[in-house]
């Protein structure tokens, strides 16, 4: 990262780092503090880092690594803009003495005030009735009762809550079969929704743990530029092959009148 990415160049980072040795990533590990410091260096003022992470349970206790990492990001100068929850629709085999574990944290860090906020408004309001006006009364200062109509301010769809339930697992995280050669699939929907929320077209999206290339793919699909780094050559090859297949497919579509995103790596 130090050699290839300049200071204050990244608009948005969306990533899910390896955590607590829950999976074997070909024997590789990472230095968290060094990674966090580099993310602060390369992030633009107003840029955002989406850090998706969880904790493992060891000897009856959760490690708490996620909280320690969040506090370290704050020590570096990041704001903790939001603590969101990624709720999975599939679960791992449960322990006998605790409730089913179905979520991970999505920490939203910003370097100063976020410069881009596009809140997704796709939550159906259950009280919406379609009426344009609501009848009512109010009293003047002298006590006189006056009948009036006021505009119905309740919209059909509202901004979603900060707990996102996103399908994950086989044929849910992605339909790209090659991606499942990676041990931990990052759901495309999760990456896409954060990209839409915290960046605009033409912005640079970064993933320092690119894995199978999900963040890069969704950035390209949504007309963002992308940068990805990956220490494992095997996973880097998977990501490149996946993105190559995507580019070939959509070049064919381009000839049929589809407008394609410009892909940068």
Swiss-Prot record:
Protein name: Orphan methyltransferase M.BamHII
Species for this entry: Bacillus amyloliquefaciens (Bacillus velezensis)
Family statement: Belongs to the N(4)/N(6)-methyltransferase family. N(4) subfamily.
InterPro entries (alphabetical): DNA_methylase_N4/N6, MeTrfase_CN4_CS, RM_Methyltransferase, SAM-dependent_MTases_sf
Enzymatic class: transferase
Additional observations: This methylase is encoded on the proviral phage H2.
Catalytically driven reaction(s): a 2'-deoxycytidine in DNA + S-adenosyl-L-methionine = an N(4)-methyl-2'-deoxycytidine in DNA + S-adenosyl-L-homocysteine + H(+)
Superkingdom to which the source organism belongs: Bacteria
Function: A beta subtype methylase, recognizes the double-stranded sequence 5'-GGATCC-3', methylates C-? on both strands. No endonuclease has been identified for this methylase, although it is speculated it might protect against BamHI.
PROSITE patterns, A to Z: N4_MTASE
Keywords recorded for this protein, A-Z: DNA-binding, Methyltransferase, Restriction system, S-adenosyl-L-methionine, Transferase
Disulphide connectivity of cysteines: none
Claim: Transferase is one of the keywords in the record: yes
GO CC annotation, single: cytoplasm
Gene3D superfamilies: Vaccinia Virus protein VP39
Enzyme Commission number, as recorded: 2.1.1.113
GO molecular function, one term: N-methyltransferase activity
GO process terms (BP): DNA restriction-modification system; methylation
